A protein has these predicted regions:
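C-terminal catalytic subdomain
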Residues: 73-178
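Short coil/turn connectors at secondary-structure junctions
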Residues: 3-6, 49-52, 91-95, 123, ...
Length: 253
């Protein structure tokens, strides 16, 4: 405990990152007020049915920077972020179909450790991303990666383990993820992703193997281009504690 009160300003932003509400004061009293508006913006009670297939695109530059949508460790984090945001409206056999150039550019100036992490995941009995955990301290203390973090504007090497920790959720909570249009499809398959040349091919394969012939399909064309919302069922009673992981969640579950 610091023993002092801190004066803070807290702005609530909309989907276009514009300020829609500003509060000032002691953080302990002021921030819960700001969270009420932020929750109304973020948790959108919209869906009247669960979706079997979700379709969206993955730009090259978003979230953590340029290259986010071209190397598969960062891509897995982004895919898992979609699970976190929308799991309340996903069916239990949901499939993602995602466009990405996935060309193997790791942007090593920004993430100098990612290629080594990816290559290590392909060997040494690494079956799922959590198996990589035992190498966390090794990467986090590797001198050259630390030097690039300190002096060359790179991310800290342990950041890659944060990405993989989140990235495992995509495998856990979807039946399959298809990457469409990959220029280096092998690196996508190396992370457990399926690859197809077109959306039509991916959709037909998903219907045949996972969803049946008449899936509920949700297209999200603005994914990763605006500030995300968390889609919820229109009826708050359908947003379960199990899906939210919190008993008093603003989505109503």
């Amino acid at each position: 405990k610091m023993g002092k009160k801190f004066f803070c300003c807290d702005a609530v932003l909309d989907t276009a990152s514009r300020q829609i509400e500003i509060h000032s004061g002691w953080a302990k009293e002021m921030q819960p007020i700001a969270w009420k508006t932020a929750d109304r913006r973020t948790y959108v009670h919209w869906a009247e049915k669960k979706y079997d297939i979700v379709v969206f695109g993955m730009p090259t530059n978003f979230h953590y920077g340029d290259g986010m949508g071209t190397n598969t460790i960062q891509m897995m984090q982004a895919l898992s972020a979609q699970v976190i945001r929308h799991k309340r409206i996903l069916s239990d056999h949901c499939v993602f179909i995602v466009s990405s150039i996935c060309d193997g550019w790791f942007h090593e100036e920004r993430w100098p450790y990612l290629r080594e992490l990816y290559e290590l995941f392909q060997h040494d009995s690494m079956n799922i991303l959590p198996d990589m955990n035992r190498y966390g301290e090794y990467f986090a203390t590797k001198e050259e990666y630390i030097r690039k973090y300190r002096f060359a504007n790179a991310f800290h090497p342990f950041h890659g383990f944060s990405m993989m920790s989140c990235g495992h959720l995509a495998e856990e909570h979807t039946s399959a993820i298809y990457i469409v249009g990959a220029r280096e499809p092998g690196i996508a398959r190396g992370m457990g992703l399926k690859t197809r040349a077109t959306f039509e091919e991916a959709l037909e394969d998903a219907k045949r193997k996972f969803t049946g012939p008449a899936p509920n399909i949700l297209a999200l064309p603005r994914t990763f281009t605006t500030t995300a919302v968390h889609l919820c069922m229109k009826d708050p009673g359908e947003n379960s504690h199990y899906r939210d992981g919190a008993p008093a969640h603003p989505c109503g579950g």
